[in-house]
């Protein structure tokens, strides 16, 4: 029953250790697990004790336990004991025999790295073997044991994430009885795993949303926190996320709605009107360092943006944007536009003087040059320009002071990489401000070449104006579309274009290398050949030709191939790629614009003084509701569903009358609801006696009937009806 002997390392394994990790990849995780499980089965077949535990062979098991040569604590390929094997295969009788013979097995964890820390209690809980769980707890199995192996971590390569404690395992498999048993035996509902996640956090991440909501309520019922402890649902993990915020980041709309139902207070019901108070704790971004709204819009999951359509988030964002966000954003856009006009004017009228001395080269066409600092501010016009330059410099400093703190707060990768948060525009505006300061330094030090940073600053500064289009529903999604095309389609296309241009430019250069450059010199110099090929690729110029001389024969062949590949194939491919990107973004343009509005609102709320942006909602202190803030929403529900049913009966009777008047016309049968929902919209053509007005009237009734019955069959809840919401503060 001894362990495996270590294998001798051959030349291959030694070479693998010496080679860099990027040359020799580690073994795939799935293959590694497959190998471990195959070794486990092999080890079970080789060990009589493990095999008897697997097969629940009690007679053999008792004989082995009486044999003094049998090591009851022997382990399998995964570092598991015989009790782990019995629990894995739900063999209660074998587990009881093993615990009677060796009670210490109850506390033994698995030693394999992938499953480290897993006890028999973890396995029994996952398999929902209630009797075995009771037996283990009776023998004082540890309810605080932690399964810390790599197979239990929150990772894309793992199919499940149940946390580390037996209680979280029981909650994730939705075993209410086992959860109660563990809590009664001292399981800590506030226990956190290595990520800081409590059992509530882990429930948010489970795929079965309905069971997760039920278990969430059960666990909260055991939260008997004292005055010195915060509520269980407000305990953050290591990322600072509470279960509520984690639901927003993950886009778990079911859990979000469930939690909001627990936070709402119905004030009154007046016929179809219902007044509801929603608790804005953790929702309102006012004064929050880790804003819920910012977390939602910056989430990598598209489902997270659906949270923005849920009550009361939708109403809160709408109020903030319409009352504060839109006016301040328009003012900010106007100020930036005036600022760019000022900077552009200063650049246009920069101090220049006539160049002294004679030109030394025939291709030199420069007639003006930059003035020295001592000569640049002498006239009245220079003083006016100086004021504009000071405004430009102060504006650049303000931009840097506003942008740099957010980089450290959010993180560079997230701040510059999230399109919804502004992403590339932050890079552009920071680069612009830096170039303005570089231009100032060059002006003060009399350094020639200020035109370089100045020209780049003008381009970047005016490109930043596109950032303010996010305040308009028609233009906002187009900025995202442009960004996706530039960083997606264009980047991929540039790699292909570079390969094609490099290959054909080299060919053109070789062809014209022996020719007279005075007759056709576009390809004589290699850099010029690259530039000419680039222009030909984009069809900026036509193919160079000189009909007074004989061109090389290979030029026609290579140019023909280049025209087919570049103009007909690759450019049209690029257009098709951009068209596909446009279609994909257009499908979610409204959703993207709402996310842009939320991100802009949070940005303005964070940067503006509190006196300019008061807190939204109703303070509960004034009405005996504590120190929390609330949002009042009025729902209007249609409480007369029988009216819709009467419309359906009218449509059915109308169909019967049409059948009697026109027996030759075949109408769809109303026996099945699916057939009613797919009522035919085709006009009857067999009868020619119907007038045009009758046909038009019949078409209108058909459309109205199809829409009404379609809504019914699509799951319209007649007990609630359609409702609209009005929010108040």
Curated annotation (Swiss-Prot):
The gene is TRPV5. Residues 349-385, 443-448 are extracellular. ANK repeats lie at residues 44-74, 78-107, 116-145, 162-191, 195-228, 239-268. The keyword Electron transport does not apply. Residues 650-653, 700-729 are annotated as: Involved in Ca(2+)-dependent inactivation. Activated by WNK3. Keywords: ANK repeat, Calcium, Calcium channel, Calcium transport, Calmodulin-binding, Cell membrane, Glycoprotein, Ion channel, Ion transport, Membrane, Metal-binding, Phosphoprotein, Repeat, Transmembrane, Transmembrane helix, Transport. The chain crosses the membrane at residues 328-348, 386-408, 420-442, 449-469, 493-513, 557-577. Residues 1-327, 409-419, 470-492, 578-729 are cytoplasmic. One of its GO terms (biological process) is protein homotetramerization. The lineage of its organism: Eukaryota, Metazoa, Chordata, Craniata, Vertebrata. Residues 654-675 are annotated as: Disordered. SUPFAM superfamilies: Ankyrin repeat (SSF48403). Residues 654-665 have a biased composition (Basic and acidic residues). Homotetramer and probably heterotetramer with TRPV6. Interacts with TRPV6. Interacts with S100A10 and probably with the ANAX2-S100A10 heterotetramer. The interaction with S100A10 is required for the trafficking to the plasma membrane. Interacts with calmodulin. Interacts with BSPRY, which results in its inactivation. InterPro entries: Ankyrin_rpt, Ankyrin_rpt-contain_sf, Ion_trans_dom, TRPV, TRPV5, TRPV5/TRPV6. Residues 524-544 dip into the membrane without crossing it. It is found in: Apical cell membrane. This is Transient receptor potential cation channel subfamily V member 5. Ca(2+) binds at residue 542. It is a multi-pass membrane protein. One of its GO terms (cellular component) is apical plasma membrane. Glycans are attached at residue 358. Pfam families: Ank (PF00023), Ank_2 (PF12796), Ion_trans (PF00520). Belongs to the transient receptor (TC 1.A.4) family. TrpV subfamily. TRPV5 sub-subfamily. It catalyses: Ca(2+)(in) = Ca(2+)(out). GO terms for molecular function: calcium channel activity; calmodulin binding; metal ion binding. Constitutively active calcium selective cation channel thought to be involved in Ca(2+) reabsorption in kidney and intestine. Required for normal Ca(2+) reabsorption in the kidney distal convoluted tubules. The channel is activated by low internal calcium level and the current exhibits an inward rectification. A Ca(2+)-dependent feedback regulation includes fast channel inactivation and slow current decay. Heteromeric assembly with TRPV6 seems to modify channel properties. TRPV5-TRPV6 heteromultimeric concatemers exhibit voltage-dependent gating.
């Amino acid at each position: 029953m001894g362990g495996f002997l270590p294998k001798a390392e051959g030349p291959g394994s030694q070479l693998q250790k010496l080679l860099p990790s990027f040359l020799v990849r580690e073994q795939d995780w799935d293959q590694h697990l497959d190998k471990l499980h195959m070794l486990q089965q092999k080890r079970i077949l080789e060990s009589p004790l493990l095999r008897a535990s697997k097969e629940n062979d009690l007679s053999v098991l008792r004989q082995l336990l009486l044999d003094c040569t049998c090591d009851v604590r022997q382990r399998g390929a995964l570092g598991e004991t015989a009790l782990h094997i019995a629990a894995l295969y739900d063999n209660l009788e074998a587990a009881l025999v093993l615990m009677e013979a060796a009670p210490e097995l109850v506390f033994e964890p698995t030693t394999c790295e992938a499953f480290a820390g897993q006890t028999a209690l973890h396995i029994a809980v996952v398999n929902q073997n209630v009797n075995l769980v009771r037996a283990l707890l009776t023998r004082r199995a540890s309810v605080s044991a932690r399964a810390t192996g790599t197979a239990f971590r929150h990772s894309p390569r793992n199919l499940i994430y149940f946390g580390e404690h037996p209680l979280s395992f029981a909650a994730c498999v939705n075993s209410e009885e086992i959860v109660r048993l563990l809590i009664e035996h001292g399981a800590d509902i506030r226990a956190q795993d290595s990520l800081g996640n409590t059992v509530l956090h882990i429930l948010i991440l489970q795929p079965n949303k309905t069971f997760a909501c039920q278990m969430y309520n059960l666990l909260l019922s055991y939260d008997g926190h004292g005055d010195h402890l915060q509520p269980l649902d407000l305990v953050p993990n290591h990322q600072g996320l509470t279960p509520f915020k984690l639901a927003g980041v993950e886009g778990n709309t079911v859990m979000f709605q469930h939690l909001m139902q627990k936070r709402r207070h119905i004030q009154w019901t007046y016929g179809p009107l219902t007044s509801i108070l929603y608790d804005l704790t953790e929702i309102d971004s006012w004064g929050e360092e880790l804003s819920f709204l910012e977390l939602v819009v910056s989430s990598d999951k598209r489902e997270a943006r659906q949270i923005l359509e849920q009550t009361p988030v939708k109403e809160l964002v709408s109020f903030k944007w319409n009352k504060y966000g839109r006016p301040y954003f328009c003012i900010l856009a106007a100020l930036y536009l005036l600022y760019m006009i000022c900077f552009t004017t200063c650049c246009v009228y920069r101090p220049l003087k006539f160049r002294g001395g004679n030109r030394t080269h025939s291709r030199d066409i420069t007639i003006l040059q930059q003035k020295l600092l001592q000569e640049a501010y002498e006239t009245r016009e220079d003083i006016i320009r100086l004021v504009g330059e000071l405004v430009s410099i102060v504006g650049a400093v303000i931009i840097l002071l506003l942008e740099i703190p957010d980089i450290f707060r959010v993180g560079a990768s997230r701040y510059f990489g999230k399109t919804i948060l502004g992403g590339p525009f932050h890079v552009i505006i920071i680069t612009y401000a830096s170039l303005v300061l570089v231009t100032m330094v060059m002006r003060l030090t009399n350094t020639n070449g200020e035109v370089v940073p100045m020209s780049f600053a003008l381009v970047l500064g005016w490109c930043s104006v596109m950032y303010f289009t996010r305040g308009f529903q028609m233009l906002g999604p187009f900025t995202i579309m442009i960004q996706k095309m530039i960083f997606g389609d264009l980047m991929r296309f540039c790699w292909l274009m570079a390969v094609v241009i490099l290959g054909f430019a080299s060919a053109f250069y070789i062809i014209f290398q022996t020719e007279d450059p005075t007759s056709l010199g576009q390809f004589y110099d290699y850099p010029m050949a690259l530039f000419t090929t680039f222009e030909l690729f984009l069809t900026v110029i036509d193919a160079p030709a000189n009909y007074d001389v004989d061109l090389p024969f290979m030029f026609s062949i290579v140019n023909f191939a280049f025209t087919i590949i570049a103009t007909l194939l690759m450019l049209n491919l690029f257009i098709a790629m951009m068209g596909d990107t446009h279609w994909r973004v257009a499908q979610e343009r409204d959703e993207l614009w709402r996310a842009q509005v939320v991100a802009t609102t949070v940005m303005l709320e964070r940067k503006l003084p509190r006196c300019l942006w008061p807190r939204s909602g109703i303070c509960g202190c004034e009405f005996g509701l504590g120190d929390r803030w609330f949002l009042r929403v009025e729902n209007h529900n249609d409480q007369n569903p029988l009216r819709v049913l009467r419309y359906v009966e009218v449509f059915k009777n109308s169909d019967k009358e049409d059948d009697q008047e026109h027996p030759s016309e075949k109408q769809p049968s109303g026996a099945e609801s699916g057939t009613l929902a797919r009522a035919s919209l085709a006009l009857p053509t067999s009868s020619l006696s119907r007038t045009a007005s009758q046909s038009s009237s019949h078409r209108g009734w058909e459309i109205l009937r199809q829409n009404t019955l379609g809504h019914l069959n699509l799951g319209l809840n007649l007990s609630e009806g359609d409702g609209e919401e009005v929010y108040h503060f």
